[in-house]
């Protein structure tokens, strides 16, 4: 039985340097039924020509003629992409090779799961969680945010 079809969708706006650094990790993902889509949100840098010259055979590129913003860019792209599961990631995301299958298995295991969000590690200090965009976090007694599952040093 084949794995469910997954579309990994990366929204890009002027992030050529980030794509150079992080897209190879996404391409190395160990999963047998996926397509990788980079959606260009009307970039003014050389992102599109870079993608076409370096990754044309490995990815699909959607080019928007206007910057639709973050949600608008993803919505525009998802209207054009067919898959059973969609993974929306930013161009600055580093993933290990085996990251995708556990997410798909979890989603398949419970039809009530509608979205899955990772704990985001700080790229410069991987022992720490990144706060930006954290969902379901807490605020400590001093007003500092922290994510569920964060390990505190004693």
Give residue ranges: language-model regions.
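Short alpha-helix within the catalytic core of nucleotide-sugar-dependent glycosyltransferases
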Residues: 23-24, 48-49, 75, 83, ...
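Glycine-rich, basic loop-to-helix element that forms the pyrophosphate-binding segment
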Residues: 63-81, 91
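Conserved donor NDP-sugar-binding/catalytic core segment of glycosyltransferases
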Residues: 96-132, 137-140
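A conserved acidic beta->alpha catalytic loop
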Residues: 25, 40-49, 66
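Short aromatic/hydrophobic "clamp" motif used to bind/position activated sugar donors
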Residues: 86
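N-proximal low-complexity "stem/linker" segments adjacent to membrane-targeting elements
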Residues: 1-28
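Short beta-strand/loop segment that forms part of the nucleotide-sugar
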Residues: 33-42, 62-64
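Short, flexible, basic/aromatic active-site loop/helix in glycosyltransferases
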Residues: 137-154
